[in-house]
Amino acid sequence: MEASFVQTTMALGLPSKKASSRNVIVERRNLITVCRFSVKTLLEKYTAEPIDDSSEEFVNFAAILEQILSHRFKACAPAGPASWFSSDGQRGFWDYIRLACSKVPNNCVSSIENMENISTARAKGRAWIRVALMEKRMSEYITTALRDNRTTRRFYDSGAIMLREEATVLTGMLIGLSAIDFSFCLKGEVLDGKTPVVIDYTPYLKFTQSYDYLTDEEERHSAESSTSEDNSPEHPYLPLVTDEDSWYNKWHKMEQKFRIVYAQKGYLEELVRLRESQLKDLEAENRRLQLQLEEAAAQNQREKRELEGVILELQEQLTGLIPGDHAPLAQGSKELTTSLVNQWPSLSTLHRPEGASNSKLYRRHSFMSTEPLSAEASLSSDSQRLGEAKRDEEPWGPIGKDPTPSMLGLCGSLASIPSCKSLASFKSNECLVSDSPEGSPALSPS
């Protein structure tokens, strides 16, 4: 069954993979060759005068360039937003040029996009070809587009001219077009964006006759030459260039070639001068930025040294202030502790017989730490003397407003009846505080 399928395929002449690959190679070679011929024709005929749309050679060149840019262009768009398509629903090489040439400085892409009389992608592509030729930047546009390999592979299938080394040859050929002045009027003119272009190959086809075959006229000429007594040439069918017209034609062709080469030489010299001026400007800008960088580095070092000196000075001041601050804090802490202990009431003021004793029991954990109260070490001596007078003369509890409001919570908690009832239940963690009028009672475990 497989053999019959292969025979059927061969009989129908279906293209195989090898034949398809050959077709792609032949297409690339044909397009590049005919493009070279077209560029040479333009350079020979229109070096001294501008070219417009009425020139048949330009129309053919534009068709060739459009075919090259459309060679193996992907028909279906990759995944993306719907607005990515052109307005006519068809994709053309303009979609590729619009993205790949957007990085060209001062490009004409936005101008073509804003043209009101051009709507289809094919018409915009043809308008771009004309504008790029008038700007003499066609080679620059194609070179920039080829550098964007990711975008190029996104729009073209394998085997396309834009993905092969022929694209580099194309950019080299397009450089010579900078010697020609193109003049097109796109304002108000509606470019045809529906009809496909057709390349005219007839101006570039030339039949070369073999030496083995002679026409009747050449045979007759050979016979006449053989009967004459004059010396005949080695190949009688090749005419000798002996008349003045032939020499004049040769001279005219050489003059045209010289003009073309001279125009290209002038363009390249101008381009070199432009690049040299740009290089000088960049070198001057580089030197200026280098000086700014050095100045910024020196200023940074100066500021760093100044900040280091400030840090060292602050450290010295801090070191000198630390020893003088500890002594007042420690002394104030001791005075505050003494005043707090002396202000606690005796048990006789509670008027309970079971609590009558010359000593009071307090839990060790009920003492408030002096560290949180160190901020109050600056209490006035009047408040301390007032606390000592109240210890011997009256029961605990302020008659008026206590000048030490931070002690009210502690006084209330110790003077309450439930706290006095719980004194008998204190155990191993209790301590005795003497009710004697001495300055600071000694603490001793029970």
From Swiss-Prot:
Region (Interaction with RAP2A): 1-298
Modified residues (Phosphoserine): 232, 416, 419
UniProt domain RUN: residue ranges: 52-189
InterPro entries: Run_dom (IPR004012), Run_dom_sf (IPR037213), RUN_RUNDC3A (IPR047338), RUNDC3A_B (IPR047340)
Expression sites by tissue: Brain.
Phosphothreonine modifications at: 215
Keywords, alphabetical: Coiled coil, Phosphoprotein
Pfam families: RUN (PF02759)
Recorded family membership: Belongs to the RUNDC3 family.
Subunit structure: Interacts with the GTP-bound form of RAP2A.
Protein name (record): RUN domain-containing protein 3A
Taxon lineage: Eukaryota, Metazoa, Chordata, Craniata, Vertebrata
Protein encoded by which gene: Rundc3a
